[in-house]
Amino acid sequence: MKKMLVVDGNSILNRAFYGVRPLTTKDGFPTNALYGMVNMIRKQTEATGADGLAVAFDLKAPTFRHGLYDAYKAGRRPMPEELAEQLPVAKELLAAKGFHVLELAGYEADDILGTLARHSGSAACTIATGDRDSLQLVSESVNVLLAATKMGRPVTDRYTPEAVREKYGVEPEKLIDIKALMGDSSDNIPGVAGIGEKTAGDLIARFGSIEYIYDNIDTIDIKPGVRDKLKKDRDMAFLSKKLGTINCDIPIDSDPQSYLLKAPDNFKVTRMLADLEMFKLIDRLGLEISSAASEPRSEEKPVPVCAEDDFDQLMTRLKSDGESYFLWDGEKCRFDLGDKVLVCDCENEGFYPFFVKLLEDRNIKKYTANIKSLYSFAQGCSALCRNMCGDLELEGYVLNPSASSYDALRLAGEYSAAVPTESGDENDCAAASLRRLFAAMNKKIEENGQQKLLYDIELPLARVLSSMERTGFAVDRDGIAEFGSRLGERIADIEREIYSLVGYEFNLNSPKQLGEALFDKLGLPAKKKTKNGYSTDAQVLESLENKHPAVRDILEYRTLSKLRSTYCDGLLKVIGEDGRIRSTLNQTETRTGRISSTEPNLQNIPVRSPLGREMRKFFVARPGCVLVDADYSQIELRVLAYISGDANMIKAFNDNTDIHTVTASEVFDMPPQLVTPMMRSRAKAVNFGIVYGIGAFSLAKDIGVSRSEADEYIKGYLRHYSGVDKYMHDVVEKAKKDGYAETMFARRRYLPELTASNANTRAFGERVARNMPIQGTAADIIKIAMIRVYERLERENLAAKLIMQVHDELIVEAPENEKERVSALLKEEMENAVRLSVGLVADVHSGRTWYDAKG
């Protein structure tokens, strides 16, 4: 053995538990500590290149230290239940990974670490821990990787003898003398009363040990008060040294060769990680779920895998079954026939005629994955997809919107539906699992009451999104290029102005050089400093905006540079030959149910600044057409009124009064006619702040008032809208009881954060519990509206096309002679998407460009 890694299991697991956000399986079993621990040990193993590895754990039983001092570790809080549940699983998982797991009655994990380190011989030994006690073990052949938190971020510091000397001013073995004097409240080691870390460190740096100090207590040069304290607690000092000293000679096998890494049981590791729903970790460790799936259950034989090119025979079989389960990736198409898997080569000249015929057959139910891609394929063939009954990705998303992915094989592992195949190929195993997997997922969807969400919203929406992606959005290429040039000229002017104000040229895009210019050269007050230099983030610069004109110029420089690089240069790269941009519309990316847009993100075109809004001038209708733009008015507030049942809010909406003016009138105790624009603006911030779950601190920052003022605004709001206040309380309590929050259409978001030990994490969970039903319901409503608009356009044989969705806004490209009809259609379908206790209102406008239609 050349290198040995010795891990403090309890310490690393504990750090992972508090450092990783709460994670649970769908059944509620906590997994965050396990996830963090495996990742941390993996990184430590790679960093050290260890060929030997042992993980040490504490036992619950008392140790020899309790025999020395009854109060040792007294008062320490018990391990949180969510962490205790993960401890035995952690040990089993580490053993399956081929690591040596050690624990010994009467001793602590530290003693195991010390003994293995002391006897590591010629092997370089690294101790991985989050406990500084292990620093006493550092030597020329023993280093410590200390996991810590700095500025809210996890870091790992390597301690060599030199690093210990530099930080503490003493040799590593003398750290225990410092602890003997200062004590350790976390372990209830008493030390000498009144002696703190600074005094203890100074004494040991000068005199070397407590033995020397006490042997010469009356003659050494120390303050009289310190001498008195030392004399008074002499026995406690020596007891504390015994308690804090790691025993490096306990009765365990200390031969380094006994701890060589063993071959991992990859099947067991994969099974365990799949059961824990850690599918990203399976990928990261280079494992395959198919390796677990290929291990047959005792009663189950692997199914055969056969190549198929007799498409007439296959069609006859599928017609007879009345259903088909398949996975198509463009190269192969695999069919699960129950008793076998048939693999079709897509390059076979007979495949696509057969496949199109299958997709169009209204009598054969189709169960597959990513039906959006199939709709797109069929549209490209001038064909139709009929009777699409199941999509693994959409069903997985409906059941758990927080999952990392919805890959078929991963879902099979998650729902215990994996079927082994004779080939052992991952894709074959995924296909073989389809029937069993759909049965398991459909049963769960039915149990959750989510059939309407799946069958009336998500499955039909896939066809709409496919059409929108294929249609795309026309843009003015020359206009974007010219706008980018104008931005470039303005950016160059700003650069020159900044250099003139600072007095020299530097790289404006270098945070380090910018920090030096602002804080060293100009002498502005530094707010934050990182290990790489001064912080120059937006928050810091905005706080300095009135301190020097260069800061305003820098903020403008950043805004314009992003506008040019992201929205001018970026968009020019993705314009198709036909002058249209085609964004990918993602149906399974957000936890609230919202649709997202990527490659490029057209939902993120700037709207806050006049210059940003100008980008919308370059999104145009094709010749002879106009853009008809419709967006919901205050949909989230209307949803809040409905789900809270607040009488005042419902009345305000149904009376068609301005909700922000009404709120301002109540919050500021002012007749509506006397409400000023500033009052209305602040009331608007309160209205939407309640929806998004922000508190007084964030509201104060947003509207520029004191925290106490913001708190009064919120209290005034909740006094007037008492139904909202009750909803905010009740919905959190319900989420705590159920483990999830849900929309009016039964879309769920599971919230393990609500049971977290960390107060900040729990507070985050409560905010999500309050706003997810509002945001999620609004997202569901716009999806229903999209389906209604798309089907109505199709049903009435209109040439107009739905081309974009931006949160609460829909955009249709329509021939000029269809403009009025499409405008009326959009308004009607959006306002009648659902029936609430308050009416939905859609504002409709049109124009040649997105800017003209929306502004």
Features from the language model and the residues they span:
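Noncatalytic, basic helical substrate-engagement surface that gates or grips nucleic-acid strands
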Residues: K2-A128, R132-R158, M236-L239, T245-D253
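Conserved RNase H-like, two-metal-ion catalytic cores of nucleic-acid enzymes
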Residues: M4-L5, G9, R15-A54, D70-A71, ...
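Non-catalytic nucleic-acid-binding/docking modules located in mid-to-C-terminal regions
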Residues: A50-A54, F99, E140-N143, R158-P302, ...
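Short alpha-helix plus adjacent loop in nuclease-associated cores
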Residues: A71-E85, V142-V170, R227-K229, C389-A432
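Conserved "right-hand" nucleotidyltransferase catalytic core of DNA-directed polymerases
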Residues: D233-E347, E360, K366-A369, C429-V607, ...
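Function-dense linear segments that define catalytic or interfacial modules
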Residues: L337, E393-E422, D428, S433, ...
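C-terminal polymerase-core module
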Residues: E489-R496, S500-R552, R719-R767, N771-P773, ...
